[in-house]
């Protein structure tokens, strides 16, 4: 087996963070963690899987026929993967499914599959619970720009038709993305959930940059790129300092956090810290680094972040107003308040983010 990491030649004006071979480091980290610790990424068992809850509810009704709400809850909520789902959450889901006719109430008060639900469960793809790649049409005003799969949420940028566009709205029912042209480049968008990377991998990537070990499985070009990256890291201090000034008011933050802790930090910066820090133009390359412009100095940055991390805030505060972050297959049939709750409390790694932020106090 071979890992092949393809890279574009960096342009002369490329900023330091973009010259580091992140995918190469990630590959090294995965191999080393298995060689040293026999470590593989653990399953995530503490999420709020409302999309899967919908699927299990509909498949249970389809296979058993009429059930009372209590009988249905007894069959579904006792499954170990739903241990964090409360009775109130399940009640909200059932009421919503009755409202949209995916479930129907019989004269005797029992529950059966509704007419709209029949169309879903009779589709041959119903039992494929994982999200599939579906094409979305991208439009700007009256013009059709092309198609993409798995669109990013509003506020993210995409590259299509030779230009950079910011996503304004995603119509999940019509499979349409509405976008506006903007200047600039497009940072890598890795999605909010699929293909997530554990914090342990990022920490091993940092160690690979800071140590001088030679990995015998690397080919010549990979060894050369690693040596170059280690030299860049040593000169810039990126391996030991989380915040680096790139000149003027431009900064880069290396959190060395996994996908969901990184996403939580990004949102805390934008929602809770941006005004006090004079922070703007935050440009993430998840989950490796984020660049931004900031009026505050380094000491103030760490002080403000630590102050926010010490607060016991509600996770839902890190979800933007009006945002409904769909990313699982059946999220569109789940009540919006549960989709938001599932993302805030089941996806974002707020505790992991807080621990890392508070560990930066020595840099303040």
Per-region residue spans from a language model:
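A generic structural motif
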Residues: 111, 175-180, 280-303
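C-terminal helical accessory/scaffold domains
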Residues: 222-223, 227-233, 239-272, 292
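Amphipathic alpha-helical transducer elements in NTP-driven molecular machines
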Residues: 17, 21-28, 51-54, 87, ...
